[in-house]
A protein has these predicted regions:
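Conserved hydrolase catalytic core segment
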Residues: 80-120
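Conserved alpha/beta-hydrolase catalytic His-Asp/Glu region
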Residues: 119-125, 133-192
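Conserved loop-alpha-helix segment in the C-terminal half of the alpha/beta-hydrolase fold
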Residues: 196-233
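Post-His helix in hydrolase/transferase enzymes
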Residues: 233-248
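Conserved catalytic-core motifs of eukaryotic protein kinase domains, centered on the activation segment
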Residues: 30-32, 55-61, 121-122, 210-211
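Structural signature of beta-strand start/N-cap positions in the alpha/beta core
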Residues: 17, 41-43, 79-84, 105-108, ...
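Conserved HGGG/HGGXW glycine-rich cap/lid loop of the alpha/beta-hydrolase fold
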Residues: 4-57
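Active-site loop/oxyanion-hole signature of alpha/beta-hydrolase fold enzymes
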Residues: 36, 46-90, 241
Length: 252
């Protein structure tokens, strides 16, 4: 929307389109297994948010609403009518913002290890601390963060692969992204939603379903046992089955 280059992968045909949004510091290749799995039945899109993967980083506003507009720009470029939005981590709030920009087009939002508690505002102090941590020692901060996103006995090859893919995010983009989240009120955005909100979450951090239902009475979550922050790369077959079930339920 602001002229920044957006790079995305697209496969298949058929609506609703499935649109996959990665988390902070990640990139679209985290969803390669979903493009392959769902392309026979749906148009599947996975994009790199600005500052991530192959997308550009020439922008001044880095908020979650701006990322939501980026998602809509890609969806519009692909002439998609109806769609379901999937968002991992930061991609969850981004999916909410994208849905709010596209009334009547989104059939639902599915968080992927996100929305553990939707009544949440990100404080400036919290993001400033995180931004400074990454600015000082990006590689060290990334390693420490990834250590908190997997179970201790997770497959070391999968953990190393995630770290390698995330190490390509420029530190300046990481800092801008963290600072751009300050003051974002997820609860207020969720209250405005008129489409179903779902989550496929790991069990590393608890999901407060009852608290979420106070804001969004139709909220539902499926918890994958002994899975961390990236179920799509940790147990792709099980994850894909849950995605298919969720899509079927939202389309019915």
């Amino acid at each position: 929307p602001d002229g920044v280059e957006l790079v995305y992968s697209v496969a298949g045909q058929g609506e609703p389109a499935l649109v996959f949004i990665h988390g902070g510091l990640a990139e679209r290749s985290f969803y390669d297994g979903q493009l392959a799995e769902f392309a026979p039945r749906h148009k599947v899109i996975a994009l790199d948010l600005p500052g991530h993967g192959e997308s550009g980083s020439d922008r001044t506003k880095w908020g979650i609403p701006e990322f939501g507009a980026d998602v809509m720009a890609v969806v519009d470029a692909e002439k998609v009518g109806q769609l379901i939005l999937f968002g991992n981590s930061l991609g969850g709030p981004v999916a909410v913002e994208a849905a709010l920009l596209m009334p009547g087009r989104a059939l639902g939002i599915v968080g992927i290890d996100t929305f553990q508690g939707v009544d949440y505002t990100i404080s400036l102090e919290e993001v400033r601390e995180r931004a400074e941590f990454f600015e000082k020692d990006y590689a060290g901060a990334l390693k420490e963060m990834i250590g908190l996103l997997f179970h201790k006995d997770a497959d070391p090859a999968i953990v190393a692969d995630a770290e390698k893919r995330m190490s390509g995010t420029p530190p300046e983009a990481a800092k801008a992204m963290f600072l751009g989240m300050a003051g974002y009120d997820l609860g207020a955005a969720v209250r405005r939603l008129t489409v179903p909100l779902r989550a496929i979450n790991g069990d590393l951090y608890p999901t407060d379903v009852e608290a979420n239902r106070k804001l969004k009475p139709d909220f539902e979550a499926v918890i994958m046992e002994h899975i961390g922050h990236y179920p799509m790369i940790e147990r792709p077959e099980e994850f894909n089955r849950l995605v298919a079930e969720t899509v079927d339920a939202l389309v019915r």
